[in-house]
Regions:
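Glycine-rich phosphate-binding loop of nucleotide-binding enzymes
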Residues: 1
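A cross-kingdom C-terminal cell-surface attachment/processing module
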Residues: 467-488
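Extracellular Ser/Thr-rich, low-complexity/disordered mucin-like segments
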Residues: 452-469
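Perimembrane helix-loop junctions in membrane proteins
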Residues: 16, 488-489
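Sequence/structural signature of beta-propeller domains
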Residues: 4-5, 11-457
């Protein structure tokens, strides 16, 4: 959702040093993008747009091109009133590898009414070879989430919003609505493939952090990957200890890992939640979050796993998510059921703090990236409990950065300017989609010689609503399944 509209005239800086951190923090590794140099002025290598070509900043060696503009056919760059045109207000996105030629597909939501999802098909050399729709006639498709079995979950951010499962290589005819995931203003989702759970953020001012846990009957085998049907299971909300029943934690309350529990929520047959989350009193359930935004699952490499203070096993799977109303980035340690704020403006000394954090993505090498909803229009690398780094900024303002997603090898990053210049002459404000190339030296994952402790036993049984879930497949199998499917600028 776009809120800020004031134009930014020059790159805004994320500088300074972090204040003293709490002694107890989740042991989260840092990826190579934490070491990027300062940004510099960029000229688009393809798809130059008047009014934007001189407003893009990224580090040296990171090339930027425009790959699609609203109202134009992405292949021809021309209007196609009787053919396919790139959609209005591009938002959340993801990338899927193609097995037949080594290429990939980037999918992008349309946060409009009617909304939907568009797809851009690239070959192995990064050439755009096709563009098409995979979901139509929905409402305000904001963000969503990628599944390990190769589908895209598109979220409607509206009252009574639903989640729709789409095939990136298919069409609108193959999309399926999933009411069991609840009917509320969905923002984004992420799948925990180890424990068969779908985590969800809810947009708004006083919302909840959700998960759907599949029953055994909801699971099936899909080319060696356990697939969640997302139709039979339990819907739950998270409660941070001491902040149950609509409680709201201040930043200082969660800068070190805090224990959580999960409370089951009842829904009707249409997915409507049978309690109003906006009533934050004793009738509600769960901890209150200030506007849930992007979310992404990351599995820490085995050699880098460590046991956190307050935990019993090494941290393995982590859900990173953002809350816009208070500009926080959170990390939830699934195995240890601990949650922590890993970034917030109040705890970091910077000249220009986060401006409405929104979409979240984690690179294949473990870098956590956040896109901003506000007018500063930045893509920022979040260093857990450390200093953020500016990766990209479009200083034109009047829009927001959306849909960041990496190719599986981490060599390319896609994103959109939701209200960026559109149309043949760039005079429109319907949105544009871009690609950044990532140099190889910033794609190498961190390594460690020995892990701290044993890999957690994912076959242990649940221990109540707050306990571990049933065992499943490893996250790496999901990537194989996808492949099997047809801040400071340098002086100018």
């Amino acid at each position: 959702m776009f809120i800020g509209a004031a134009a930014a005239s020059s790159p805004q800086v994320l500088i300074g040093r972090a204040q003293a951190q709490m002694a107890s923090e989740l042991p989260l590794p840092v990826g190579p993008l934490a070491n990027i140099p300062d940004v510099e002025h960029k000229t688009l290598t393809a798809g130059a747009i008047d009014g934007v070509d001189d407003e893009v900043f990224a580090p040296p060696g990171f090339d930027v091109r425009c790959v699609a503009r609203e109202g134009l056919n992405p292949l021809t760059g021309e209007s196609a009133p009787f053919g396919y045109e790139w959609h209005l207000d591009p938002d959340g996105g993801a990338v899927y590898p193609a097995a037949d030629d080594g290429g990939w597909v980037y999918v992008s939501n349309s946060e409009d009414t009617p909304g939907g999802v568009g797809a851009l098909r690239f070959d192995a050399d990064g050439n755009l070879i096709d563009a098409y729709s995979i979901l139509e006639d929905t409402r305000n498709n904001c963000a969503g989430g990628q599944t390990p079995w190769g589908t895209w979950l598109s979220c409607e951010e509206t009252t009574g919003g639903q989640v729709h499962e789409c095939d990136p290589f298919g069409s609108d005819a193959t999309a399926v609505r999933k009411p069991a995931l609840g009917s509320f203003p969905h923002e984004a989702v992420a799948i925990d493939p180890i424990h068969h759970a779908c985590y969800m953020t809810e947009d708004g001012g006083n919302q909840r952090f959700w998960r759907f846990v599949s029953d055994e009957s909801d699971l099936s085998d899909d080319n060696g990957v356990t697939r969640m049907g997302l139709e039979s299971g339990t819907l739950q909300v998270l409660s941070i200890q001491g902040f149950e029943d609509g409680g709201y934690p201040e930043a200082a309350d969660a800068r070190s890992p805090q224990p959580v529990t999960w409370e089951t929520v009842d829904i009707d047959t249409s997915g409507r939640v049978l309690f109003p989350t906006f009533q934050n009193d004793e009738t509600t359930q769960g901890t209150r979050f200030a506007g849930g935004e992007g979310i992404w699952y990351y599995e820490i490499p085995e050699a880098l796993r460590q046991t956190p203070a307050g935990g019993s096993v090494p941290t393995r799977g982590v859900m990173f998510f953002a809350t816009k109303g208070d500009n926080r980035v959170w990390a939830y340690d699934i195995e240890n059921q601990l949650i922590e704020i890993i970034y917030d403006n109040d705890n970091m000394q910077m000249e220009t703090g986060f401006d409405q954090v929104d979409n979240v993505v984690v690179s294949p090498s473990g870098d956590v990236l956040v896109a901003e909803d506000g007018a500063l229009m930045r893509l920022v690398v979040v260093v857990p409990n450390g200093q953020a780094k500016l990766l990209m900024q479009i200083t034109k303002g009047g829009s927001e950065i959306t849909g960041p997603a990496f190719t599986p090898d981490g060599s390319r990053l896609y994103f959109s300017s939701q209200r960026g210049p559109s149309g043949a002459d760039g005079s429109g404000t319907g949105g544009a989609t871009f690609e950044i190339t990532i140099p190889e030296e910033y794609r190498t994952a961190p390594v460690a010689s020995t892990p701290d402790g044993e890999t957690p036993d994912t076959d242990r049984p649940p221990t109540g609503s707050a306990g571990a879930l049933t065992a499943a497949t490893v996250a790496g199998a999901g990537i194989a399944a996808l492949a099997n499917r047809a801040l400071r600028p340098a002086d100018e």
